[in-house]
């Protein structure tokens, strides 16, 4: 049976990043990419005061954490992420799940699951 690659993209508050990384590491999710992003969702930004004037801030700072899993159940990742991130307030974020058709490790040419697996005996420099 061929193992399926699934990409999980989590967009949430920057203040939750360390808790999210720790929780994902505990369930075996170690490889991830994190980006600082700005977005507007249902909360549509907020107002800030600068030098006595009020300004609309339409884009709110967020982080995006992306990971690809094949052994760890997707539902487990979703459950853990929601548990860590949910405050019940606007701005908790979104999680997107994508099926991947392939992945390529550029250095070796490995494809599919082998492209994201740890290779025994190899160390990053």
Listing of model-derived features with the role each one plays in the protein:
Residues 1-125:
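Positively charged, small/polar-rich N-terminal and surface patches that mediate targeting and assembly
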């Amino acid at each position: 049976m061929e193992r399926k690659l699934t990409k999980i993209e989590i967009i949430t508050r920057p203040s939750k990043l360390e808790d999210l990384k720790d929780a994902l590491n505990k369930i075996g999710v170690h490889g991830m990419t994190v980006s600082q992003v700005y977005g507007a969702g249902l909360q549509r930004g907020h107002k800030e005061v600068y030098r006595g004037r009020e300004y609309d801030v339409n884009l709110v700072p967020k982080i995006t954490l992306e990971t690809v899993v094949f052994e760890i159940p997707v539902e487990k990742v979703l459950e853990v992420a929601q548990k860590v991130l949910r405050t019940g307030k606007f701005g908790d974020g979104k999680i997107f799940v994508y099926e991947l058709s392939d992945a390529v490790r550029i250095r070796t040419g490995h494809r599919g699951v082998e492209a994201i697996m740890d290779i025994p005996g190899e160390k990053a420099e």
